[in-house]
Amino acid sequence: MTKLSYRQAMLIKHTAWMNTRLLARGPRPEDARYVPLAVRMLTLVGCLNYAMLDLESELTASGLFHHETKRRYTQAQTLVTQAHGIAWSMLRKIDDRAARQYNDKTDEAYRCISDCILLEAPQRSYNIVLSLCRIISSLNGRISGRYNFNPAKPLVRIPALLECIGIEDCKIDGIIELNLTD
């Protein structure tokens, strides 16, 4: 058994007391505002994972997937995979049903995004990736500390990583946000 100092024991007691008060009080009013934003952001992180896979196949098919592009794409894909994996495992820890709903919502959202963007490949996937990164960053910035998803913060670097591809950014953020419904 480890010995605790008096201050440590009092801190543990106070933390336990505060937790019981928070549970008894129920959700805070700002939870009603932040939860839909957090759900949308996590869904878009999943969509970004799909968009990166589409981007790889479209770049390969068009012959633009050269050494420097592959290297930078791999760095970007690593960032996306980490964020998506953490989001999925976080929801799976809550409940298996929550993880399945996350997958279903992500599939539906990506299908909607793909259907509303009428650009040609690989410009289509490239613009979807860049726009999703900007939207995720914007949503994450609007969410307070409790719902803030720190693994999504590095996704801001993806547009700079993929800049070497040389495809024009059409800034389709508004189109994606307009077509996504909760």
Where are these regions (language model features)?
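Long, low-complexity or tandemly repetitive, helically biased scaffold regions used
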Residues: 5-179
